[in-house]
Curated annotation (Swiss-Prot):
PANTHER family in the record: NAD(P)H-QUINONE OXIDOREDUCTASE SUBUNIT I, CHLOROPLASTIC (PTHR47275:SF3)
Record protein name field: NAD(P)H-quinone oxidoreductase subunit I, chloroplastic
HAMAP family, A to Z: NDH1_NuoI
Family, similarity comment: Belongs to the complex I 23 kDa subunit family.
Cofactor dependency: [4Fe-4S] cluster
Taxonomic source organism: Triticum aestivum
Predominant location category: plastid
Catalytic activity: a plastoquinone + NADH + (n+1) H(+)(in) = a plastoquinol + NAD(+) + n H(+)(out); a plastoquinone + NADPH + (n+1) H(+)(in) = a plastoquinol + NADP(+) + n H(+)(out)
GO terms (BP aspect): photosynthesis, light reaction
SS bonds (residue pairs): none
Amino acid sequence: MFPMVTGFMSYGQQTIRATRYIGQSFITTLSHTNRLPITIHYPYEKSITPERFRGRIHFEFDKCIACEVCVRVCPIDLPVVDWRFEKDIKRKQLLNYSIDFGVCIFCGNCVEYCPTSCLSMTEEYELSTYDRHELNYNQIALSRLPISIMGDYTIQTIRNSSESKINKEKSSNSRTITDY
């Protein structure tokens, strides 16, 4: 009869322990009810990209000297640089520059090693199309500046309203390179 009593006592202790664990999990769950949701509704809300985000590449035709360093440092030899040698000025003349973003891995080596800084990474990441051939950007498409997420009034950014009001007041007085 003694083992039966100890069995009931251990059963009671296990029940109390299980009740305590369930209570702790309920408290943890209820403590998260005041939090904002982490998931964003992508087409209508966009997260703000970090300062050094590696998005679409921006190209400045006038700065390029056709040295082809970007092609040499690219792991997949992606940029296509067409040039001709001008004998009268003894320099390369850039004719065409293109990048296929369907193949690009956005490593940023071309931007990092460009001696004239004619390449830069933008915050634009929406490059989806129905035809993969539309992702082959020439120098005209590459020189197009991206629409800033902060300036687009149709999109809500993921920030607290008081924080975004302070930032709007600061940004109305001065514009940075990322505010196009």
